[in-house]
């Protein structure tokens, strides 16, 4: 098949809207789609300092690459989770990605600052639970300590549709009231944005291959059997039969999101006695779980690795 816009061979078939695109026109299409998402939801401005959380995977790498290409002021943060055999590979991919992108890279290794890696802590909590807590805290604290205006993550349309379906099935109305492509800044909680909110996982993979971004393909050993994978499977079946299902599902939710806002429960926000970050109690969940006695200061004067790129 030929590209819709030129005589070159098609690189990819876009299912919604249905069209064939060559590699060059696909890259233009993808970048334009991300740019429009940023503009539509007022995610970012060119004068903001943006911290992109890069895991070594495809989504975060593509997020950093596109934001850099669109002219945004980005730096990257990689959190090494201390998972033997997996985290070492992830860090190496993050380094390669930032070298190609030309973005400064900061690295936080939790085993060095907390004493244990994910999966090494003696606790009844599943690894995914305290891993998520740890990553969210470090991303926000690092961004706050270093004066960033926003944190950008690599959540794509498939991720958002699966989260949405799971939260509807469990009637998690607080998530439904707060979900979406942007979480505005609130005090010491830095603004979080999702530039890939309306692009599919398939499109992200195709773009990464087109621009030469290598990424880790192995899944985290603790992610197997995760509910998200089940939700994605259901949505993929629906998408196969009715192209546009994921997009319309997520867009429809955003139109009706205000219906859930009365469900938001106002919580008293305190300041953690240890790290001075926002907390619902005297000690925040992060400091409590890791047994911290003093604040971790993530302020840096230069990147942990030399800034990559030109």
Swiss-Prot record:
The keyword NADP does not apply. One of its GO terms (biological process) is tRNA wobble position uridine thiolation. Binds 1 [4Fe-4S] cluster per subunit. The cluster is chelated by three Cys residues, the fourth Fe with a free coordination site may bind a small ligand, such as exogenous sulfide, thus acting as a sulfur carrier. Gene3D superfamilies: HUPs (3.40.50.620). It catalyses: 5-methyluridine(54) in tRNA + hydrogen sulfide + ATP = 5-methyl-2-thiouridine(54) in tRNA + AMP + diphosphate. One of its GO terms (cellular component) is cytosolic tRNA wobble base thiouridylase complex. One of its GO terms (molecular function) is transferase activity. The keyword Zinc applies. Disulfide bonds join 128-220. InterPro entries: Ncs6/Tuc1/Ctu1 (IPR000541), Rhodanese-like_dom (IPR001763), Rossmann-like_a/b/a_fold (IPR014729), TilS/TtcA_N (IPR011063), tRNA_thiolation_TtcA_Ctu1 (IPR035107), TtuA-like_LIM_N (IPR054306). NCBIfam families: TIGR00269 family protein. SUPFAM superfamilies: Adenine nucleotide alpha hydrolases-like. This is tRNA-5-methyluridine(54) 2-sulfurtransferase. It comes from the Archaea. Zn(2+) 2 binds at residues 272, 275, 284, 287. Its cofactor is [4Fe-4S] cluster; Mg(2+). Pathway: tRNA modification. It holds the Pfam family ATP_bind_3. Changing residue 59 to A: Loss of binding to ATP. ATP binds at residues 53, 79, 135, 154. Homodimer. Belongs to the TtcA family. TtuA subfamily. Catalyzes the ATP-dependent 2-thiolation of 5-methyluridine residue at position 54 in the T loop of tRNAs, leading to 5-methyl-2-thiouridine (m(5)s(2)U or s(2)T). This modification allows thermal stabilization of tRNAs in thermophilic microorganisms, and is required for cell growth at high temperatures. Can use free sulfide as sulfur source in vitro, which may be also the sulfur source in vivo. Zn(2+) 1 binds at residues 3, 6, 22, 25. In TtuA from T.thermophilus, the sulfur inserted into the nucleoside comes from the C-terminal thiocarboxylate of TtuB, but there is no TtuB ortholog in P.horikoshii. Free sulfide has been shown to be present at relatively high concentrations within thermophilic archaea, and may be the sulfur source in vivo.
């Amino acid at each position: 098949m030929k590209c819709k816009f030129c005589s070159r061979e098609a690189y990819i078939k876009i299912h919604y809207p249905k069209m064939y695109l060559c590699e060059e026109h696909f890259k233009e299409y993808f970048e334009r789609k991300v740019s429009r998402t940023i503009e539509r939801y007022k995610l970012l401005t060119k004068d903001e300092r943006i911290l992109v959380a890069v895991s070594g995977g495809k989504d975060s790498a593509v997020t950093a690459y596109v934001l850099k290409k669109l002219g945004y002021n980005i730096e990257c943060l990689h959190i090494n989770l201390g998972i033997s055999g997996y985290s070492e590979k992830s860090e190496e991919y993050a380094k390669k990605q930032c070298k190609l992108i030309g973005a400064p890279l900061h690295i936080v290794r939790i085993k060095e600052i907390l004493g244990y890696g994910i999966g090494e802590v003696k606790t009844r909590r599943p690894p995914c639970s305290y891993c998520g807590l740890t990553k969210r805290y470090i991303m926000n604290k690092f961004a706050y300590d270093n004066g960033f205006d926003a944190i950008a993550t690599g959540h794509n349309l498939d991720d958002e549709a699966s989260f949405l379906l799971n939260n509807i099935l469990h009637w998690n109305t607080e998530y439904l009231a707060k979900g979406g492509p942007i979480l505005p800044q609130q005090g010491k909680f830095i603004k979080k944005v999702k530039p890939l909110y309306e692009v599919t996982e398939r499109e992200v993979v195709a773009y990464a291959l087109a621009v030469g971004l290598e990424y880790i393909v192995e899944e985290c050993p603790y992610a197997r059997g995760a509910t998200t994978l089940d939700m994605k499977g259901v949505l993929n079946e629906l998408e196969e039969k009715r192209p546009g299902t994921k997009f319309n599902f997520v867009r429809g939710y955003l139109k009706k999101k205000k219906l859930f806002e009365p469900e938001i429960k106002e919580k008293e926000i305190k300041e953690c006695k240890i790290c001075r970050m926002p907390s619902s109690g005297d000690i925040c969940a992060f400091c409590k779980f890791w047994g911290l006695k003093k604040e971790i200061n993530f302020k840096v004067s230069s990147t942990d690795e030399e800034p990559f790129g030109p």
